[in-house]
Amino acid sequence: MAEGNTLISVDYEIFGKVQGVFFRKHTQAEGKKLGLVGWVQNTDRGTVQGQLQGPISKVRHMQEWLETRGSPKSHIDKANFNNEKVILKLDYSDFQIVK
């Protein structure tokens, strides 16, 4: 498998004005557009968290989007990514918004 096609999984948490600005909906749409799977949810800390899975090149693109763009009315202060690992298969079949 070529480097750019290696499947990875990474957890994320986004800080800033990311709740009440359709951040989850836009994250789901961007993830699906890139062909990624995973999930996104609001936390009781006022952040958004989730997990991305897919080819490393697509996950890197999504990480940049989460750090710099987000939804139009969001303001991202910080993006944390952790638990990155190579995976052999995807754990999800879609990109879901978790309530």
Curated annotation (Swiss-Prot):
Q: Which Pfam families match?
A: Acylphosphatase (PF00708)
Per the database record, which ranges form the Acylphosphatase-like domain? 9-99
A single Gene Ontology MF term assigned here is:
acylphosphatase activity
**Active-site residues?**
24, 42
Reactions performed catalytically = an acyl phosphate + H2O = a carboxylate + phosphate + H(+)
Q: Which SUPFAM superfamilies match?
A: Acylphosphatase/BLUF domain-like
Q: Which InterPro entries match?
A: Acylphosphatase, Acylphosphatase-like_dom, Acylphosphatase-like_dom_sf, Acylphosphatase_CS
Supply one GO BP term.
phosphate-containing compound metabolic process
* Keywords assigned by UniProt, alphabetized: Acetylation, Hydrolase
Q: Which residues carry this modification: N-acetylalanine?
A: 2
Tissue specificity comment: Organ-common type isozyme is found in many different tissues.
- Highest rank taxon of the organism: Eukaryota
- Could you say which protein family the record assigns here? Belongs to the acylphosphatase family.
In Swiss-Prot or TrEMBL terms, this protein is called: Acylphosphatase-1
